[in-house]
Amino acid sequence: MKSPALQPLSMAGLQLMTPASSPMGPFFGLPWQQEAIHDNIYTPRKYQVELLEAALDHNTIVCLNTGSGKTFIAVLLTKELAHQIRGDLNPRAKRTVFLVNSANQVAQQVSAVRTHSDLKVGEYSNLEVNASWTKERWSQEFTKHQVLIMTCYVALNVLKNGYLSLSDINLLVFDECHLAILDHPYREIMKLCESCPSCPRILGLTASILNGKCDPEELEEKIQKLEKILKSNAETATDLVVLDRYASQPCEIVVDCGPFTDRSGLYERLLMELEEAINFINDCNVSVHSKERDSTLISKQILSDCRAVLVVLGPWCADKVAGMMVRELQKYIKHEQEELHRKFLLFTDTLLRKIHALCEEHFSPASLDLKYVTPKVMKLLEILRKYKPYERQQFESVEWYNNRNQDNYVSWSDSEDDDDDEEIEEKEKPETNFPSPFTNILCGIIFVERRYTAVVLNRLIKEAGKQDPELAYISSNFITGHGIGKNQPRSKQMEAEFRKQEEVLRKFRAHETNLLIATSVVEEGVDIPKCNLVVRFDLPTEYRSYVQSKGRARAPISNYVMLADTDKIQSFEEDLKTYKAIEKILRNKCSKSVDGAEADVDAVVDDDDVFPPYVLRPDDGGPRVTINTAIGHVNRYCARLPSDPFTHLAPKCRTQELPDGTFYSTLYLPINSPLRASIVGPPMGCVRLAERVVALICCEKLHKIGELDEHLMPVGKETVKYEEELDLHDEEETSVPGRPGSTKRRQCYPKAIPECLRESYPKPDQPCYLYVIGMVLTTPLPDELNFRRRKLYPPEDTTRCFGILTAKPIPQIPHFPVYTRSGEVTISIELKKSGFTLSQQMLELITRLHQYIFSHILRLEKPALEFKPTGAESAYCVLPLNVVNDSSTLDIDFTFMEDIEKSEARIGIPSTKYSKETPFVFKLEDYQDAVIIPRYRNFDQPHRFYVADVYTDLTPLSKFPSPEYETFAEYYKTKYNLDLTNLNQPLLDVDHTSSRLNLLTPRHLNQKGKALPLSSAEKRKAKWESLQNKQILVPELCAIHPIPASLWRKAVCLPSILYRLHCLLTAEELRAQTASDAGVGVRSLPADFRYPNLDFGWKKSIDSKSFISTCNSSLAENDNYCKHSTIIVPENAAHQGATRTPLENHDQMSVNCRRLPAESSGKLQIEVSTDLTAINGLSYNKNLANGSYDLVNRDFCQGNQLNYFKQEIPVQPTTSYPIQNLYHYENQPKPSNECTLLSNKYLDGNANTSTSDGSPAVSTMPAVMSAGRALKDRMDSEQSPSAGYSSRTLGPNPGLILQALTLSNASDGFNLERLEMLGDSFLKHAITTYLFCTYPDAHEGRLSYMRSKKVSNCNLYRLGKKKGLPSRMVVSIFDPPVNWLPPGYVVNQDKSNAEKWEKDEMTKDCLLANGKLGKDCEEEEALTWRAPKEEAEYEDDFLEYDQEHIQFIDSMLMGSGAFVKKISLSPFSTSDSAYEWKMPKKSSLGSMPFSSDLEDFDYSSWDAMCYLDPSKAVEEDDFVVGFWNPSEENCGVDTGKQSISYDLHTEQCIADKSIADCVEALLGCYLTSCGERAAQLFLCSLGLKVLPVIKRTSREKALYPAQENFSSQQKSLSGSCAATAASPRSSAGKDLEYGCLKIPPRCMFDHPDAEKTLNHLISGFENFEKKINYRFKNKAYLLQAFTHASYHYNTITDCYQRLEFLGDAILDYLITKHLYEDPRQHSPGVLTDLRSALVNNTIFASLAVKYDYHKYFKAVSPELFHVIDDFVQFQLEKNEMQGMDSELRRSEEDEEKEEDIEVPKAMGDIFESLAGAIYMDSGMSLEVVWQVYYPMMRPLIEKFSANVPRSPVRELLEMEPETAKFSPAERTYDGKVRVTVEVVGKGKFKGVGRSYRIAKSAAARRALRSLKANQPQVPNS
């Protein structure tokens, strides 16, 4: 009796279950609508996992299809049973024995066990050798090794001789166990087992039960026999049955197509032609020598293919294929050299043409004639017509299409990749008439045998679609698997073919095509969607082929149709029966033989009465879970738990039968679900109900603990039940475009004015404060930089100086440097006297002088500014001071002010006339300290010059330097018509008064502290020494300005001093505010305390020979300073430091010397040895033991030695000259001379030197360097004269706070970047720890969602804005003429409004306002300081610029004045219009004599020149800057765009992200200054909770008064500080106190025998503890750190995900902190690169493998097992650490392989999770974690610091910024992602990987390899 499925169906009886006719309605069958979530059975687990379960449970024979799965099962089983084999052989431990058939398999197994476990493995493969061993020798082996891998012969020998008894074996593994059926040692070994009472567990492995055709009876017998011999149950892997045995089985149909009737006779005729030709060729006896090609081969192949097409598809197709083959043949004929071969090819060609001609007689090839196709084809078309969609479906299914889910893919490997970015290409023309790709309800595959059949059948179906509207919906394509095989090398042409195939697959996956015609290649291994129609056009010939093609029909309603010719049908039915029988046998062997399909037949019955549903809000029909839907809910919930691409978490259900015949089920959820206990259901009548009921109970529990939401769906990470964590803030309403928190969004803020300077203009008869601005030259300009050989003018040489008069006191701020032409000048602001009053007249005089300084000396007044001292927000007076009558007391210099008022030269040019009668008389003393004005030119803005030198040897009659004039007198007569009255007067060499008013940074260094190139130093020297380049003036023609040069030089510093003062006061104010908000530091500083000086932290390095400057003793005596002293460095010292690294920067020690107090003995001896040795490429001083040393060196580092700006210095001898902090005036508090020695740890333990005069060494700052560890201890113990103040107790140095407020765009000597990075990693750490401890039940997905919300730029920006940071930030370069508002001035609204929109002075500030030039990289806002061409001197040395550039800038500088700038926020750059620089109409400059006038040009606008070349400025579309001009109406930016217009003097425009950066930098600043607890409190005060709040009772408040000392809480974030040790004080309003974080209480679950299980699971881990040198107090942490989510045998702890979340942040912080504290002081860029090079998965995974983490890893995931296996092998071969730049590919010969070796993320994860585990286990001690991890990471940190690696993608983009373009992702045939990078002109490079990111870096790495290989040929531009 035939089974109904096999009835041959006639045409009429073909009943297909198509989606359209399905009872569930037309859409149910959309293949992509169905999620891969099973609703009526639990999601099946991977078959290998179930086989492992079986093997753990009982003796098992594993029948697998492939070899790879065998190893996995064997190794994991060994590991699971490993606790039985650790330790000495009997009595306690046993041994595991692996038996293999041949010697060469031994090594393979050995490496597998060694790779994945730490067990000791012995290998025995040589019978001769092993047979001769004695019993003793064997027992040694057994003692040493726990796993024995031997060939069966050796094993038999060992067992027979009793060297090892079977009872000592815990597990016996037989590889290739099917051999036991034959007469084989395996059989004898099993015989021995029979006699043994305690037989070991047996595992048999076989892959060859099924080979080719075999008879079901035989098969069954074979299996039974094997089971009997091995005393085991055979279990097959599902891959032999049907790939997913729970998928509903497809409906199988065999169709009898009926005979082919050849009415026209064409078929017969063609067949005859072909057969004759084939016979003819076969008969030609062409002698074939073995070496030659067979001449007939190609012809035979072509003809037989053609014949096959004719037979299978009919004449129409044969015609098509003949046409294709003719084209193909032409190529062969053209290239064929040999005559004979050629003849055969031509013969074939002729025949094919003949066939085509015959066909043309019968039908027109253009259209399809169904008379000429076989019945099989007709049948196929008929089946396809049934799948035609209904009309209405065409609309509704669009929705499904859009919601389709990636779960529809068979392969899981794509679960993490997005392919949204793939462009959908234009379809080929024939498809255009299809309604749309959405209507494809069909998703089908037709399997054919031959390639040509596939190609032609596809053509035929396309033709049929054109003619038959019923078939028009089909969009088909074919895939032949040509060259798709994985490993063979591929030619270019094959490569193209391969690409085409992948495109076909991509379209099929995307449902753009709905029918695929394929050869058997698609049967296995290719990732394609679930199909609802599979047609076997050619019948399957063996079981495997049958099962695998059937396995493709996996949609819920699917048909598997086999088309058979009438003559074949009988024999096929026999085959089919066999296949079915085999399938059945194998099914029974399936480890879970519940047959999904049959069990569900009665699913439709309403079971609600059996067990009531779980309903929410029953009254209003709320959501419910019924007994029928519960399993689906549980599956869906498990699928949403966090996991990696390798693991798909599924529930595990065990059903047991009770004695009374009822069943109960126990349900276990994956181990990372918060519901950890197993759930036991009530007993039910049948298995199915038992399983369902337990699921229903589970849903109820999940809902109760908040894991299912109110719709009973899994709670996503977004709908966090921890609402309070995401303080949901209302997003501010702004009209500003851009995403909040991003760089694209900029807003304007007013610039902050410090409270103490706000409206503090002195009033008559009210008490005032007078401050002195002390100026001391601490580092004179070295000769190398003094190109003009100018004399240096130390400001302290003259007594007259400036002071500040104010109505409010100014807090103490650190001294700070300004850089004048003479060198570095240290500025101090000291209180001179207070409480005095001034009269109205005095104040008026002072006010007039104040205005005179800013308007006339500094020329800062412009139309837009108005002097209104009473109305100005920031108002105080600047006035001259001098010593009073020979005493040394300074006071206000009223006489001087009055003299100035009277002077004629005060404003204009005095009109003195000399004549022959009253000739000019030269008085030398008048000119010694004078500023002079030429009286004959530039009357509106006369030039002012310092007299540099009086040339007594020159007179007006001396020779004029240029040939046009004879003498100076003649020049003036000719050019200006001036006659001189005194021809004997000397001439004056003059210098311009400085126009550079930004003196914040030295001009020979850029803002990174790096010397600007001095290439032209020699040229310059020559230039300045020749007279031609000097300005020579005649005294008679000049007027003397009433302000002496010495005071003028000080006045030039005023803008910089006041600006810096202003910024530091803002920072000090912020420090005080934080002290009251967060309780960190004190509100007001003690009167006797001053912070160490502001320091840029770089040594001023210059590229030149070492120079020696001597101590100028006369100065030293007068002024109490020894002025310039440096270490004298021998010329060759630099070369001795042989191992110099480019990063090295502090190669010589700097020494400061300060005059000792009077009681100490006279002169200070400086004896510093010059013997510098190089240690690690850094030179240090060997013998610094002299007592004077400490004093000498201590002032140099200034506490926050945060040397931010180290840059790579060219490797040339470099010298440092000292920074000296010299204090002025006796009445100031004694400064603390503290210093953190950079090189502390190298100073031979000599750190504790004391100062020579016995004054105790004072230290006020913690050592920030790691090198300063020793110092740190000393600091804690010492008592300093300033009562032990330190920034730990007082708060950070305002200088450091200022640094945290300064963006890199400000081009200052420091910026926030380094601090920001430190703050960033600490913030991540603090929040992570807080979340980890506060939410012990939240899984990693939720924790990381909460973290990302908290640390997002958007959130930080909000908090920073709330705290008022934007106003305090320093965002643009200080340029006094453009954006500085002098004290007492206001922006004149009337004048500036008129000009708000059109300004011609939009110089650089527009570009520098903040953010990058045009192009915002996401990482950092960096702006390279592009100085003009000769960078070294942009101040006032004549630079060679084009005439028109100079005119342009001059005209800009003479422009209208108010600097308002406009930024267009349009996304498009209007580059053409934005850069028309318009000249003002009054271009009165004409052509000017180069030698003089050009010198006057104001280089303070040097930056305008940087932007002369528009191409450099705005590259992309961030914002466009318009340069506006009053005289031109509509130039510049299109007025349509939205723009921000703001006033540069009082407002600043800042990107949101910069504010977020600033918050992080401030955090870094508090962290380095006040420690970790303080940083946490600072975060809490911002509103970021990182500590638990505790409420204190009033009694406690009394116990812990507000101002408690802070140091008690300095324990690193440890949970050990008592919860009551709360913050010292919070702001009065909020009574919040913060406690300390508590370690989450339990890490083990309540479990009856938890301890036992724990010891069981971590057996062997003691070896690992030894390896990392840390012993766990609580071993559960250790187990948790190694438990992967797939490892369900661990029922007592969670998996590692939470610890990984914690460890990731801890390692990031520790590594960042270490890099930050590196004595090499890496620059921000290097720091970022190093951090990303060290904190990444590749490095962590490599280290994990190096330290054997993988051997202890606990996971049950076959794919992961293989990836780890590959990676470990790869690491062993490479045997070196992998950096980002490392070659992650297998070896040289894999050049063709596009894929990098895959780095298993799980390895990096356990590296992190172990850090988290140690942190928790050690009571939250970061130190302990670092002690364990630093030794592992140290070699890498050293290696990378010396040579910073960059990610390949970045390196490529830096190398080829214009030409490298990455393609979007393409999906490869096996589900991976491919990315192509094209480097224009140099080739295309491809990379493949599991995700877009991995593929992208693989591609970049390939491109780099190729570019580097070809570099020599590329000329270096």
UniProtKB/Swiss-Prot annotation:
Domain Helicase ATP-binding: 51-227
Site (Important for activity): K1801
Biased composition (Acidic residues): 414-425
Cofactor note: Binds 2 magnesium or manganese ions per subunit.
Annotated residues for binding of Mg(2+) 2: E1700, D1805, E1808
Source taxonomy: Eukaryota, Metazoa, Chordata, Craniata, Vertebrata
Gene: DICER1
Residue ranges of every copy of the Dicer dsRNA-binding fold domain listed in the record: 630-722
PROSITE patterns hit by this protein: DICER_DSRBF (PS51327), DS_RBD (PS50137), HELICASE_ATP_BIND_1 (PS51192), HELICASE_CTER (PS51194), PAZ (PS50821), RNASE_3_1 (PS00517), RNASE_3_2 (PS50142)
Protein name as catalogued: Endoribonuclease Dicer
Entry EC number(s): 3.1.26.3
